[in-house]
Each structure stands twice: as structure tokens, then as C-alpha cells.
Amino acid sequence: MAGDMQGVRVVEKYSPVIVMVMSNVAMGSVNALVKKALDVGVNHMVIGAYRMAISALILVPFAYVLERKTRPQITFRLMVDHFVSGLLGASLMQFFFLLGLSYTSATVSCALVSMLPAITFALALIFRTENVKILKTKAGMLKVIGTLICISGALFLTFYKGPQISNSHSHSHGGASHNNNDQDKANNWLLGCLYLTIGTVLLSLWMLFQGTLSIKYPCKYSSTCLMSIFAAFQCALLSLYKSRDVNDWIIDDRFVITVIIYAGVVGQAMTTVATTWGIKKLGAVFASAFFPLTLISATLFDFLILHTPLYLGSVIGSLVTITGLYMFLWGKNKETESSTALSSGMDNEAQYTTPNKDNDSKSPV
């Protein structure tokens, strides 16, 4: 019996870590595939709109069946909150992120997203959702150092390509022409990095905003479904920035259709629900610490599935990123242990002091 209880505690302790790892590994594969779809020439916000619509359709039955008895009543304020959530975490974020992805590569996009823990941590300190005093503790210093190492690994991977260490040859989807756009993409490389950075900041703001929203509206399936519905319409409006041709919405390329469905189901519905749950469990800073894994996942997916060359810089940068992530989680674990020990000590103190008060009140005068 005691062994079963201990097993349950272990599962409860590590389930957020397992879920966040799986979620971000999946996101790495989504980013690599979406990059290939963008190279075909599809309007990036058309991909975003379809992706959000598919996410909403997938989540409707889950929200209805699993949360119909626990779902709070929708108020106008909650509708506005989900509209803002859709802007920060989906439509505007995708507008800048996919635009930057079209100018750069899946590896670079994931590398810049790897700075999410640092940005979220800094914003959390600014908005006071993280305590400034933790910087004076060992756990706090481990989190800061781990975050800085994550950033270093991401920057190393981005700016140091290094020699090719594999014999794989780049493989691209048939019918897509890359040669004519190579020079344009090289010229817009810095602009693409700027767009990706803006997208990462928006994603950080969404994670902090979602931390508050998940308390007011704790139904993760319904919340993600509402967010996806609003974001689908927002993406459709933002698509007018690039083109107003109705034919852009007609997609007959099977590869692109497959990527959009995969991105909607896995990259939006599943990962957003998982991230929302992770934020609710252990906070926005904790959830953001796993985003560097998308970098490693995208690099491996490019190499093993899409057969793009593997470079030394990618390997070294990935190893440095993993080291930083491990240090951050180490610090987070120490912080959790300290909080648990403190609360246990307070409970024990209350347990011992309460009987004394009762005895004093019953003692004769």
C-alpha cells in the first residue's frame, strides 16, 4: 500500500516534466515540416488559420464530454481574455514567427525560441509573478545560470554552423523551387531573426497571461478551443497583409495539406493543452524551460526524416542547450523541495502548538 502511494507521488511529481518534454519534441517536428510547406509558397497566415480551425474542431468533443460538468459560465470578461490569449499565443505570434521562419530555417527559429525561458523569466520578474528574492538562493542561481546556458547554446547553434559531419543530402518536397529565393532569404536573414524574436516575446507574454487565465478558467480543453476559434478568425484577417487572392485558400498540394492537419492536431491542439496544463501545475517559467527541446527535435527531424545535412554547430549547440535545461530543472527541483519542507515544518509546528492551547484553556484557575 505504501509502495503504491509512493508510486503515485512519483508520477504526480514527474508527469509535468514528461508531458512538457513530449510536447516540445512534437513542436520541433511541426516547425521543421511547416518550414517545408512555407518553401512551397503558401501564405503563412493561411496555414495559421487552417491550423487553428483544425485545432478547434479537434477539441470541441473533448471539451464537451470531459468538461461539461465542471466548466464555469462564460462571461464577457472571459471571452475578452480568450480573444487576447488568441492574439498573443496564436495569431500575432504565428504572424511574426512564420514570417521569420520563411526567411530563415527551422533550426534558427527553434534556436531563437530557445531563449523563451530567459525572456519569460525576465518578464515574470518585471510583472512580479516570480519573486526577486529567489536570486539570492542556490535554487534561484541555478535557474538563472541554466537559463543563460540555454541561451548560449541557442546562439552558438545559430551563429556557428561548423563542418558537415554527416553524408546526408538535402531533400526537399517535389515541385518546390528554392534556388531563386536563396539570395532573397540571405538578404532578409536578420529581418527574419527580428520577426522570430518578436514572436518569442509574444509567446512569453502569452505564457504569463495564460497562467492567470488558467486560474480563472481551469478547463484546459475548453480554453484552448475558445482560443483557437478566435485565433482562426484573427489569422484570416492577418492573411490579408500578404495577399487578398481567394485562390490562396485553395490548397491542392497533398504534402501541404498533411502538414497543416498535423500542425493543427499535434502542433496546436495537443501541445497548447499540454502547455496550459504545465503552466497551471508549476508556472509559466517552468513550462518555458522546455522550449529549447524544440531546437534539438527540429535538428534531428531535419536530419533523420527530411535528410538535411547535420553540422557540428548543431550538435554542440544542442548539447549545451540540454546542459542548461538540466541546470534549470535542478534549480526548480530544489526550489520545490524547499517549499515542501517549509510547508511541512509549518504544519508540524501547528500540530504541536494547538494541543498546548487547548490544555491551557482547560487548566484550573
Swiss-Prot record:
GO terms for molecular function: L-glutamine transmembrane transporter activity. It holds the Pfam family EamA. The chain crosses the membrane at residues 14-34, 46-66, 83-103, 107-127, 139-159, 189-209, 221-241, 255-275, 285-305, 310-330. The keyword Membrane applies. Residues 340-356 have a biased composition (Polar residues). Keywords: Membrane, Repeat, Transmembrane, Transmembrane helix. The keyword Transmembrane helix applies. Residues 27-157, 223-329 form the EamA domain. It is a multi-pass membrane protein. It is found in: Membrane. It comes from the Eukaryota. Its main location: membrane. InterPro entries: EamA_dom, WAT1-related. One of its GO terms (biological process) is seed development. Belongs to the drug/metabolite transporter (DMT) superfamily. Plant drug/metabolite exporter (P-DME) (TC 2.A.7.4) family. PANTHER family: WAT1-RELATED PROTEIN. This is WAT1-related protein At1g01070. It comes from Arabidopsis thaliana (Mouse-ear cress). The lineage of its organism: Eukaryota, Viridiplantae, Streptophyta, Embryophyta, Tracheophyta.
